[in-house]
């Protein structure tokens, strides 16, 4: 609609560009014979058999068909009543047209006016694209006019047709607890109700067959009572000719990874996770599908009790390039995983497999954050694991990061384990002993502490093992004035170690340490 001056109004800043694109595409194909959408000559618009997009052309024709139900053109003002006809044979298509008309008229232009070609170029609106898709969905699906009684106008709802699935659909909606039937509720952290069956008229016989096959497969993989059936099923597949076997395995992999919900339902189930691990390294194509699913859902799997068991099999089943993809994800999520109860365990397991630059980067990341990770109830396990691995650079960096905190760590449950592992490491021991040596008061206090007394015992035994006689004598002498008090409470454990293991040894062996009196 033009304004009083005969000019089209300026586009509004709140335009809907996506819907505009859909409308312009419609107009583009309608103009294939140099006709404007809404012109009377447009009734023969699909007579051109060489039209570049027949489905879109059909959609436009369907618009015209319903717009003409009241002898109105798709751009006439009277068209606003089109959805008030409750007896219209196809309300969804009418709604789609009205949505198209609504956004096309956003700047008070009729859908057939030439000004519509540049309507609101700054206008994003996915709902318009949805409206356009609805046009294609309902318009003449099987060469029938929308509104005919045949139910074939609807596309087949092929829910689990494995012939049409691939790894391309991994980017599914956010994960929610599975609503698949749980054949054994106790074997999964989720439980739910079965999927409601679709209307029978929407489901073809082939879909029923595929759906039943997938349902049976999932049942075998997640049910404790049927798990042996799944193993037998794979053994039978191994007897097939190579090509047929590969085809069946690819079908299985496609079915299990086509949606995020199905894959995570299996991966987070006790038996489902075990079944997925069995599938690795049976076929290159199957390995690729499973790896892509693991890669896409990496963090969710690493933080799940059963899902974390899939990471190492996935790493071992693929080539170096794909391995590094998981290595990189591990590095990126290091600190997030380290603070999770399951994530810290999964991270430690993966560290046993990682090689190359990402291993060093993870070590560096943990070392740089060791001052707070060591006090974290879960992060401390990651720090301890790196200390056990005895990487010289990482261990030295951790010890330097913890300098000044060893007494405080020694008197906390999780921190005491970190200090003990530092004492047992050739790359961190000196830093710990230096701090203990410089504060006699705290050294004595540790002997009666609930957790610190174990650190004192460990320090004494390490110095004996490493034959550091002068230094060991120095530490014992600092405790001697307090032996009486140590006979009561937790100090008696340290006193027993000194009397039974240390005192007699001090004067027997030559000193082999670098320390001097």
From Swiss-Prot:
Residues 42-51 have a biased composition (Low complexity). SMART domains: Pumilio. Pumilio repeats lie at residues 258-293, 294-328, 329-363, 364-400, 401-437, 438-473. GO terms for cellular component: cytoplasm. Sequence-specific RNA-binding protein that regulates translation and mRNA stability by binding the 3'-UTR of target mRNAs. This is Putative pumilio homolog 21. InterPro entries: ARM-like (IPR011989), ARM-type_fold (IPR016024), PUM-HD (IPR033133), Pumilio_RNA-bd_rpt (IPR001313). It comes from Arabidopsis thaliana (Mouse-ear cress). PROSITE patterns: PUM (PS50302), PUM_HD (PS50303). Residues 69-84, 177-190 have a biased composition (Polar residues). PANTHER family: PUMILIO HOMOLOG 16-RELATED, RNA BINDING PROTEIN PUMILIO-RELATED. The keyword NADP does not apply. Residues 33-57, 69-94, 107-130, 175-201 are annotated as: Disordered. Keywords: Cytoplasm, Repeat, RNA-binding, Translation regulation. The pumilio repeats mediate the association with RNA by packing together to form a right-handed superhelix that approximates a half donut. The number as well as the specific sequence of the repeats determine the specificity for target mRNAs. GO terms for molecular function: RNA binding.
